[in-house]
């Protein structure tokens, strides 16, 4: 009887490992391309209407939301701008007070934030409230590595 229980436990463990591995593989985030028109350097100011339209059309893009009245000791916008220029990509920008009128505000509650959006859905974003993201705001290479975990460059 003990032997049967041991065999059943081993089988359940093996099946669990197989299932978890399978779901881990499926849930793995695949890199994606931005829309073609975002593979040229620009820090393009957009309105909340533009963002809502891009979401509705299920577009893929990078969005920077910022507070125009906030000045930081470390000029994060220069980090983002330098990266965009070096990699020849466009980052859309919107003031946070306008950003609040988008659907994305339900998820991203703080500025300064960079949001990676694929097919109209937020994949990830820099959270200004999390200590783990501070280095990404301060270093072009670290910011670039973070972006390139999700986005394929041309």
PLM region spans:
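Hydrophobic beta-strand anchors of alpha/beta hydrolase catalytic cores
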Residues: 61-63, 91, 114
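N-terminal leader/targeting and pre-domain segments
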Residues: 3-17, 21-58, 139-154
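Thiol-based oxidoreductase modules, predominantly thioredoxin-like and allied folds used
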Residues: 65-67, 88-102
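Local sequence-structure signature of Cys/Sec-based thiol-disulfide redox active-site neighborhoods
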Residues: 47-86
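Non-catalytic, surface beta->alpha helical segment in thiol-disulfide oxidoreductase systems
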Residues: 116-154
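Structural micro-motif
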Residues: 105-119
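Short acidic, S/G/P-rich loop/turn micro-motifs used as interaction or catalytic elements
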Residues: 68-72, 99, 123, 130-132
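Solvent-exposed, acidic/flexible segments
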Residues: 44, 69-73, 136, 140
